[in-house]
Every structure is written in C-alpha cells, then in structure tokens.
Design a protein with these regions (language model features):
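Interhelical loop segments of eukaryotic multi-pass membrane proteins
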Residues: 1-5, 170-176, 213-219
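Intrinsically disordered, low-complexity terminal tails of fungal membrane proteins
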Residues: 208-241
Length: 241
C-alpha cells in the first residue's frame, strides 16, 4: 500500500467516513436480526422475510445513486447514505421490545438498505479523483476492503459495549431480559454516535476534487523507462559451390 495515497486531498477523511459508516451498518444488521430472534422470539424464516426490504432498498439505491452521480456532488450522495444509516440505528435503538414490525423495524431496514451503495459508489468516485492514475486501482480496492473491515470492527466494539452493559446490569440485580435490551440499545446508540461523527467529517472535510485530466497525458515520474536495446542478428548463408 503506497503511503502517497493518504496524502491526497480529502482521501484520509474519506477513509474515516467510509469505515465509520460501515461500522454502523454492521451493527444495525446484526442487532436488528438479534432483536427479532432473541427478544421477539421470531423464527429464522420470519426474520429472513422481514429483512427482504434491505435487498429491495439496496437495488433502488444503486439505480438512484447512478442517476444522481452526474448531477450531485459525490460527497452529498455519501452524506445521504450516512443519514440513512444514522436514522436506521436510531429507529432500532428506540423501538420497544414488543412492537409491530411495520412501525419502526421496517423503515429502519429500508433506510439501512440505502446506506452501503450510496456510500460505496460515492466513495469510489471521490477516491478515483483524489489520487493519480497509477494509484486509482489501489484506492478503489481499499474502499472495497473497508466494507468488510468496517463491519467486523463495528461488531467487535459494539459487542464489547453490550457485554459490559449486561455485566453491569447483572451486578445491579436486573433480569436477564432487561440486561439484553440494555446491551442492545447501548450498541445501537454507539452505532448512531459514530454515524453522526462520520456525517460531520463528510460535511467538513470530504470534497469531490476537480478532475481536469484528459486521456493519459499524465506522466508517471517514478516509473523508470528502460532504453530500447536493439539486437542485430547476422544470418550467414552458405556460399554457392
């Protein structure tokens, strides 16, 4: 990984926005399913059906972001994605333990479906415009990798928060059900908090660099050009007798 890519304008801030937003996505996906299975005692099949709006929202987000990218600055499209996951985490964190699916869980899952594609597509455009051509592949790969790392990192931190909250509630004499609810809410509020930080970073530091480059006229300075070596081969033919 060349360190030069992190010196590009807005690139470091872009990395922070992407990883924080994907941390929240992972937290919301895990705890929305856990809430339905553990606290509401729904079957795995019912939980899978309840999560179908996520896929529908993701498909709609791809089409909508493709329409918006030529018309709206990429950082604002990314901001819309972060707002969606922020709204999803707040809806999930504030829902009662027993509530109809359509009241808060359904809109939260729909909002959640819009975040990954809005953030990912906008981040790819910004990353490609922020670095030189020789680093565009590396920058794009890094954005894709942050999806997985963000999900894993977010779940790791959220699970630690949940465990500590449950441990503290148990020492206070609370019931097991109350402990689980408190831990889930704390993890989801943590996700909302880092999504809010991601949104602030996007507004403050992430910008779409202007790209005036045409064709492949940009010279790559650090690539050594080897001189052409001409090898002449002499072909001797036997003389006629």
């Amino acid at each position: 990984m060349p360190l030069a890519v992190f010196a590009a304008p807005t690139f470091s801030a872009l990395i922070a926005v992407v990883i924080l937003s994907y941390m929240t996505v992972g937290i919301c996906m895990w705890y929305s399913m856990s809430w339905q299975q553990v606290l509401r005692d729904l079957s795995v099949l019912q939980c899978g059906i309840n999560f179908l709006p996520f896929g529908i929202g993701s498909v709609a987000a791809v089409a909508l972001s493709a329409y918006l990218l030529p018309r709206v600055a990429a950082q604002w499209i990314m901001a819309v994605g972060v707002v969606c996951v922020l709204a999803a985490s707040l809806l999930l964190a504030t829902q009662p333990v027993q509530q109809t699916y359509w009241q808060q869980t359904f809109p939260a899952i729909v909002f959640l479906g819009f975040c990954p594609d809005f953030v990912y597509l906008a981040a790819q455009i910004i990353a490609s415009n922020s670095v030189s051509r020789k680093h565009q592949g590396v920058a794009s790969s890094l954005i894709g990798t942050l999806n997985l790392y963000g999900n894993a990192l977010g779940l790791g931190v959220a699970a630690t928060i949940e465990t500590e909250i449950v441990k503290g509630s148990t020492e206070d004499g609370s019931s097991q059900g109350e402990n689980s609810v408190s831990g889930y809410r704390a993890a989801l509020y943590f996700g909302a908090g880092i999504a809010a930080v991601s949104l602030l970073l996007d507004f403050a530091f992430v910008r779409m660099p202007k790209n005036d480059r045409e064709g492949w006229e940009e010279e790559i300075e650090d690539v050594e050009q080897e001189p052409d070596v001409l090898v002449a081969s002499a072909i001797q033919r036997p003389s006629a007798a």
